Amino acid sequence: MTNIRKTHPLMKILNNAFIDLPTPSSISSWWNFGSLLGLCLIMQILTGLFLAMHYTPDTSTAFSSVAHICRDVNYGWFIRYLHANGASMFFICLYAHIGRGLYYGSYMFQETWNIGVLLLLTVMATAFVGYVLPWGQMSFWGATVITNLLSAIPYIGTTLVEWIWGGFSVDKATLTRFFAFHFILPFIITALAAVHLLFLHETGSNNPTGIPSNMDMIPFHPYYTIKDILGALLLILTLLALTLFTPDLLGDPDNYTPANPLSTPAHIKPEWYFLFAYAILRSIPNKLGGVLALLLSILILIFIPMLQTSKQRSMMFRPFSQLLFWTLIADLLTLTWIGGQPVEHPYIIVGQLASILYFLLILVLMPTVGLIENKLLKW
């Protein structure tokens, strides 16, 4: 008798995606982050659902409803901090996943890559509107500063900002709609993730060498299911350690002060995972220029497949490209540090140099080095 998992219409889909899926035998732990992102998404949706049961999206009660969750709801503090730190784990996995794609040339699967960039933008939007919900000082001022950037768009800017705010400032209407967005977006992310997987399974996974591995495939289960379970346990362990020992390590103390439109915090800054983009935004002394640089810092990922000049897909056998890749990582860490610093000397000039280097590496240096490596190999 044929196995039910191979014949049942629904089981067949799951079987082909997670059980009998032919997978390259050589993929390393860098390929774990896809499944970890799926786990993060499930955890965020579940903790978020329980938080939404007790949260009130109203300016007069939002802050106290979060305090109520932490004080009065059974394990409410735990759910709240799991959700807040879960977002940080989500972005750590996301950046590692993108870094893996850049290093091993996974971006050559163009449909999968483009859906991935769309997923990144959607996750960033979700995190941004979510950060506004506790209605602390940084929530309010973060929302004001970031939405205000749209006013840099010529002609329609001001109208657009007021339309998003639902009034002439960030207020009740803004909070309500941001809650609605924060609730719906994770489900859009889930749908996009399914499409991401669909396109990936059309081509099969890449591997560290970047060479087609059709002649050396193994079934996903049990080999990679057990490997993914190990990754999941490490992720959960890290998240629990963060949540139970230092829940506020990655947060901002200003967000424990209720939102006050009459008092501006000394340093307005987003959560750590947006600091690199915030540093690029601040490094240009022009509003529209800064907004364009901010957008381009993320959207540049779309152009990476077009900037591939090397005849080798992966960086595994390309030491010069590896050097530039790790320089890019160091540059992004520098930008992250600068984004959290006040706007004064020497941080301004360091931020500007790091921003220039970021675009220079991706648009000029990496493609050029790819060509040089081809020459060295006489290709």
From Swiss-Prot:
Segments forming a coiled coil: none
Pfam family, one: Cytochrome_B
Requisite cofactors: heme b
Co-factor remark: Binds 2 heme b groups non-covalently.
Any one biological process term the GO annotation gives: mitochondrial electron transport, ubiquinol to cytochrome c
Subunit-structure text: The cytochrome bc1 complex contains 11 subunits: 3 respiratory subunits (MT-CYB, CYC1 and UQCRFS1), 2 core proteins (UQCRC1 and UQCRC2) and 6 low-molecular weight proteins (UQCRH/QCR6, UQCRB/QCR7, UQCRQ/QCR8, UQCR10/QCR9, UQCR11/QCR10 and a cleavage product of UQCRFS1). This cytochrome bc1 complex then forms a dimer.
Name of the molecule in the record: Cytochrome b
Highest classification ranks of the organism: Eukaryota, Metazoa, Chordata, Craniata, Vertebrata
Gene field: MT-CYB
